[in-house]
Amino acid sequence: MAKRGVKLTLIGRRLRGAFNRRLVASRGVHTLPDRGSSGAAVAALRRGEVLAIAVDQNMRPSRGVFVDFFGTPACTTPAAAVYALRAGAPLIAAFPTRSKNRTHVVKVCGPFETSERGHRAVIDLTQKVTRAVEQAVRDHPDHWFWVHRRWKTRPPE
């Protein structure tokens, strides 16, 4: 995307290794740490940049909301929904898939909208994005793997 002139900001843990960090930066991708970046993330959206967040990771209850994922409650980051709502930006999901000729095709879903307000809007949008992830996994299970326990955090009884 950055190669095509789209400003892309990626939120996540700091990449290991100077080579990896230089590689990402050389592609025009700006990175933000996964903690303490909410102001910068919202500002990036308000500037019209694309903000990328991995939403298929297990979260601690203090940092996530429970939504349905493959029929099981999954504690999921609400960050994409929160930032989109704060910035007044559209919320979309994008899934790259590798084609037979070794290029990548990106499927874009959304924009996701809600008639809810406040915390209910965050949960509603997070559920909609999670459903899109679920469909992407169903469409291309060979493109997906988790190296962590996705459903580790359980909802309170």
Where are these regions (language model features)?
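Membrane-interfacial amphipathic helices and adjacent loop/beta segments
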Residues: 7-35
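Non-catalytic C-terminal accessory region of glycerolipid acyltransferases
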Residues: 2-4, 35-157
